[in-house]
Amino acid sequence: MFEFITDEDERGQVGIGTLIVFIAMVLVAAIAAGVLINTAGFLQSKGSATGEEASAQVSNRINIVSAYGNVNNEEVDYVNLTVRQAAGADNINLSKSTIQWIGPDKATTLTHANAADKTTLGEEFNTTSIKGNNDNVLVQQSDRIKVIMYAGGVSSKLGAGDEVQLTVTTQYGSKTTYWANVPESLKDKNAVKL
């Protein structure tokens, strides 16, 4: 009923073959585990980076506090925005921001002007500090910076009833949109709320 193997050579060969198969399986399992651990670490770091970028785009925004236009010969020649940090935002450098201008007769993207002369703006905008110590960077939520755009340099000056969509994109990629609406009458005005 039971068979006994008495030959020592055969018994050793079967044991070595089994041992080789076992070692091969352990090596394959170890390599697979290493690949899985590396992949999991890579995916975790990618997920973390994506989460941080998404968080920055949502939280590192600006708020537009007010907007007004300078009136010259019954046309708005300068559009001025007063901006501040949104709640919970990091420092926002407006010199690294862009403004998309979609106006009555032209759409373009404005970049920050490097010129010290704020009156010669073309398709650029400039900034000046209202409250705070920096003309370009919003450091605290109490800081206020005026963003100046020359409508005549972008396209034509804005007339009564015109509308401009302004979208400010910060260096983090967050966007804030403001609709500047020129009042129906500009007669005898020096400045108007937009």
Swiss-Prot record:
<dbReference type="InterPro" id="IPR013373">
    <property type="entry name" value="Flagellin/pilin_N_arc"/>
</dbReference>
<keyword id="KW-0974">Archaeal flagellum</keyword>
<comment type="function">
    <text>Flagellin is the subunit protein which polymerizes to form the filaments of archaeal flagella.</text>
</comment>
<protein>
    <recommendedName>
        <fullName>Flagellin A2</fullName>
    </recommendedName>
</protein>
<dbReference type="GO" id="GO:0005198">
    <property type="term" value="F:structural molecule activity"/>
</dbReference>
<dbReference type="InterPro" id="IPR002774">
    <property type="entry name" value="Flagellin_arc"/>
</dbReference>
<keyword id="KW-0325">Glycoprotein</keyword>
<dbReference type="GO" id="GO:0097588">
    <property type="term" value="P:archaeal or bacterial-type flagellum-dependent cell motility"/>
</dbReference>
<feature type="propeptide">
    <location>
        <begin position="1"/>
        <end position="12"/>
    </location>
</feature>
<comment type="similarity">
    <text>Belongs to the archaeal flagellin family.</text>
</comment>
<dbReference type="GO" id="GO:0097589">
    <property type="term" value="C:archaeal-type flagellum"/>
</dbReference>
<dbReference type="Pfam" id="PF01917">
    <property type="entry name" value="Arch_flagellin"/>
</dbReference>
